[in-house]
Amino acid sequence: NCISTIDVPTSGSILLDGQDVTRLRGRALARFRREQLGFVFQDANLVETLTGFENIALSLTIKGERPALVDPLVRGMAKRLGVSDVLDKYPNQMSGGQRQRTAAARAFVGNPKLVLADEPTGALDSRNANVMLETLESTNRMDRTTIMMVTHDAYAASFTRRVLFIKDGALFNEIVRGDLPREEFFDRIIEVVTFLGGGARHAG
């Protein structure tokens, strides 16, 4: 909540590209939220009265993107995330995986510097969860967008480059993937979780 600027920390600072976001106020804060942040939630949180295209375009409209660029940007991101075939459908006509990938497209289409993903695979079956994780990983790699993911799932955490373990509200451990294959990184995550006795509240 502090990173997303919903809450203000009692002390300290939060730097994004060298800018302390805790000091932003008024229009500067609104601009930061509009242009620099993207969100992917456990529930897709799509607007039910808008089509897939309109849901993805929403973040561009709020950002004030030039109208001529909206269509190619939306269709390009939809193609990358595999939801081109649902652009004319409403959320209640989509599968769970399609809804979540449409929500991810909405988060990434504006090219934010930071995307906050809160249990993005929590409501998905294993196949769709895997597709979503691969999508997040490839987008991070291709667009250099920082993704901060909160998850209780060690498998989901294994798709990241760095994992922070929080226990009783404090940072307990940190591991970095480096050049490790994902399978070996997953094993390291499991080792830490086992050491915690299942007490790791979040890994992300």
Residue ranges and their predicted role:
Residues 194-196, 200-204:
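Non-catalytic connector elements of ABC transporters
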Residues 160-174:
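Conserved long hydrophobic alpha-helices within structured protein cores
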Residues 1-159, 166:
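ABC family nucleotide-binding domain
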Residues 170-195:
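Conserved beta-strand-loop-alpha-helix hinge in the C-terminal portion
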